[in-house]
């Protein structure tokens, strides 16, 4: 669907960060960047931003939200396109980002570009629609500022995911066919994470794409012909806490213990005749 790459405002991009950018670019999916932990000592939004821009370019990596305050004084974020009351100390940075966004948005439509070059102001609706287009094509990567522990900037990020990322209802299979999504469909999902838990052993994380998986049921690994697995308890994860559930419907993320031959990127389904997901 899309990718959210989380960057550390203290330590900057890591080896895994570069790999995440590379894989998401190869897939041709929309991408967001989140500069997290901005409330920590030595956190530096601008330095992290510049490190990203070294690899992708200033006209591609553009903050959509800019932080107000630094380290322990980090208190909120402002939208560079729509917020009007901007603190004086970040006004120049916000204005520069707004200009970069308007340039990118104007490029999504010839008529929009002509009017923009003639000095005409774009409406809020035109900006929103152009923003969706440029993010969808991957020509721009919005950057967000936040602190997950202080819950600053996270609501804005979640709202943007809903507004700008592709709808999960528009899912296609590996052969390009559009897939019907709904509770009434046969359950199918994709594995996105595997880890070893000291108490539960190997945990496999699955996102349900369509249908509803049930606890204590058999599933087929469509990515590995002939492989059949058994879902025992389905677990909702909240940090280290595990909550067993009986079922997991569309959009749900759950974990399952002790799968033997299922790996990251594999498609699992209750129907062996389904087509794997990309």
Where is each model-derived feature located?
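Structural and coupling elements of P-loop NTPases
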Residues: 1-278
């Amino acid at each position: 669907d899309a990718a959210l790459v989380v960057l550390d405002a203290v330590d900057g991009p890591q080896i895994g960060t570069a790999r995440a950018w590379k894989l998401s670019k190869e897939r041709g999916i929309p991408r967001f960047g989140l500069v997290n932990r901005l409330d920590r000592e030595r956190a530096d939004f601008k330095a992290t931003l510049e490190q990203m821009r070294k690899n992708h370019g200033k006209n591609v990596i553009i903050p959509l939200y800019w932080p107000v305050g630094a380290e322990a004084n980090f208190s909120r974020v402002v939208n560079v396109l729509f917020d009007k009351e901007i603190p004086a100390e970040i006004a120049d940075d916000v204005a520069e980002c707004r200009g970069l966004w308007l340039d990118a948005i104007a490029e999504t439509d010839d008529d929009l570009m002509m009017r923009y070059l003639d000095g005409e102001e774009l409406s809020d609706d035109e900006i929103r629609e152009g923003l969706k287009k440029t993010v969808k094509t991957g020509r721009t990567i919005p950057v967000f500022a936040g602190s997950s522990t202080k819950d600053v900037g996270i609501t804005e990020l979640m709202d943007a995911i809903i507004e700008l990322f592709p709808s999960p209802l528009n899912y296609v299979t590996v052969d390009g066919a559009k897939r019907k999504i709904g509770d009434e469909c046969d359950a199918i999902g994709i594995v996105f994470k595997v880890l070893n838990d000291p108490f539960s052993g190997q945990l496999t994380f699955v996102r349900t794409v369509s249908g509803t998986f049930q606890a204590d049921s058999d599933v087929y690994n469509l990515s590995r012909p002939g492989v059949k697995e058994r879902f025992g308890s389905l677990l909702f994860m909240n940090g280290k806490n595990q909550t067993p559930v009986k079922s997991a419907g569309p959009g749900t993320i759950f974990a399952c213990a002790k799968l033997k031959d299922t790996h990251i990127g594999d498609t699992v389904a209750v129907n062996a005749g389904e087509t794997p997901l990309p």
